[in-house]
Amino acid sequence: MIPGEIITAAGEIELNAGLETVTIEVANSGDRPVQVGSHYHFAEANPGLLFDRDAARGKRLDIPAGTAVRFEPGQTRQVTLIPLSGKREVFGFRQQVMGKL
């Protein structure tokens, strides 16, 4: 073994396997790019993003941890969301929940 080496199991790892998903269309109505991180409560994302916020309540992007999706000005794209897990409590962000979902 080499110091710092990572030895992984054979095969592929499926992220977020078995979680319920919802796909929504998101449009950036602003004049600047907006980036949303993997674990951000999507319903509280930048108000310049236009989408069904009720459908996004309690959900985050279905992307690898530590990554983000960028919405360029005027861009419309579809994203897939998965439920937030754990205690399902949301604090901070834009302070629209501040407690249990």
UniProtKB/Swiss-Prot annotation:
Its EC number is 3.5.1.5. It comes from Sinorhizobium medicae (strain WSM419) (Ensifer medicae). InterPro entries: Urease_beta-like, Urease_betasu_sf, Urease_subunit. GO terms for molecular function: urease activity. Transmembrane segments: none annotated. It comes from the Bacteria. Heterotrimer of UreA (gamma), UreB (beta) and UreC (alpha) subunits. Three heterotrimers associate to form the active enzyme. This is Urease subunit beta. The gene is ureB. Pathway: Nitrogen metabolism; urea degradation; CO(2) and NH(3) from urea (urease route): step 1/1. It is found in: Cytoplasm.
